[in-house]
Amino acid sequence: MPRGDGRLNHDLLPGEKGPQDACGVFGVWAPGEEVAKLTYFGLYALQHRGQESAGIAVSNGSQILVFKDMGLVSQVFDETSLGSLQGHIAVGHARYSTTGASVWENAQPTFRATAHGSIALGHNGNLVNTAELAEMVADLPRQDGRATQVAATNDTDLVTALLAGQTDEDGKPLTIEESATKVLPKVKGAFSLVFMDEGTLYTARDPQGIRPLVLGRLERGWVVASETAALDICGASFVREVEPGELIAIDENGLRTSRFAEAKPKGCVFEYVYLARPDTDIAGRNVYLSRVEMGRRLAKEAPVEADLVIATPESGTPAAVGYAEASGIPFGVGLVKNAYVGRTFIQPSQTIRQLGIRLKLNPLKEVIRGKRMVVVDDSIVRGNTQRALVKMLREAGAAEVHIRISSPPVKWPCFFGIDFATRAELIANGMTVDEIATSMGADSLSYISLDAMIEATTIQKPNLCRACFDGEYPMALPDPQLLGKQLLETELAGGTDAADALRRP
């Protein structure tokens, strides 16, 4: 079936998407600047964090305009659409769905009218008390006898509705800033939020700081973004990270900050492994250097006699460089990646499906033939890609294929913004390392240890969420039935008060 952006919903390797992050967020307050174009370039730098939909909201001081659609940033926006978004405040979002289906209604920024004007909001992360938030929306004061309606089926629209609908004890509507101090302490999970009303840009980060969020300075304004790389691309200088549990407001009076919860840092270690751009810094540590160091430590923990080290491009390259450096085995390019293939633009026949990984990667036979190969990758989720890769390298003449992974086995699902499979689908959950190697057809398989990976980040272990590797989640989780990606679609089909809140007017 065609998607909203004209592409087709057909993966080349069914069931093997790899780790997918929730989203990328960007916000700017800069009078006199072309804030829509700055946001466009910021989202372009964050495209790796979400490819399903993109949107930008802009305020000129009196009204907020929102433009969003399905597709990549470059597919959604052009000169005409960007030119129509005039103002001095902007919020942008690039989405990959972790709660709610991939449909236009769930594209962000979300938008909602308030008693004082309106609000637009973008969210990176995933919430774990979505069912509770839906009940809270159902309990909001009724307007003209009608309950608050939520058109989307994602956790972000629930937060937007809560921020827009708060009142004090006398029933007087609260401002967005007042509402944020009341609502955010009740929101559980991972959230890096960028939101706005007509005159103010806001940003907030969950008390654990699970997803990254940074503050930057322009000559005539301020920028907030998921990653420092997005600051670089729009010419902003890095100021600091938004602290866990912090709310920042930026308007004509300057920047003000407040704390809505105590900071209990638990940054996602998988940002260092795979999710973030290599040219991003997180908590003062460069991601590329962390990945190279993971490769070095992997080589010391899992040496092997071989002729050549290659990477699964592009995410495995830094670790492969480190592995080659520490092992003394030459690093080379053995696989050529087609940068333009993600999902197919045609209906795949069975023949096309059998091509699978070859449409994404092609081996350099002259480099591979007769060689004992070390193939370095960042992670294994289900194993389909690595299995196809080993087969391809064998056919290209590799004498031996040794797989080395710069993260530990992924054994637990993520509920905080990475679309990992259910635990039953994770290959490392039901098989030993040797069994996985055999299933892939590899001569050997080794993973880096958890401690070595964490040491490579230079971040203290207690300050990192590593739940996908060790099952130690940074907060209490509700019943698994209340954590599904399609939770709100399921809720909508029911007959509860929360379902009434979710139905469209």
Model regions and ranges:
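Flexible loop/turn segments at secondary-structure boundaries
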Residues: 35, 98-99, 129, 202, ...
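Conserved short alpha-helical segments that host acidic/polar catalytic motifs at enzyme active sites
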Residues: 2-244, 249-306, 312, 400
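Active-site proximal loops enriched in glycine and acidic residues that flank catalytic Cys/His/Asp
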Residues: 195, 205, 226, 252, ...
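A conserved beta-strand->alpha-helix junction
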Residues: 152-153, 157-162, 331-342, 437-457
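Phosphate/diphosphate-binding loops
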Residues: 182, 230, 237-238, 245-246, ...
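PRPP-dependent phosphoribosyltransferase catalytic core
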Residues: 184, 199-200, 235-241, 391-505
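Short, glycine/charge-rich flexible loops or terminal/linker lids adjacent to PRPP-binding catalytic cores
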Residues: 328-373, 384, 411-421
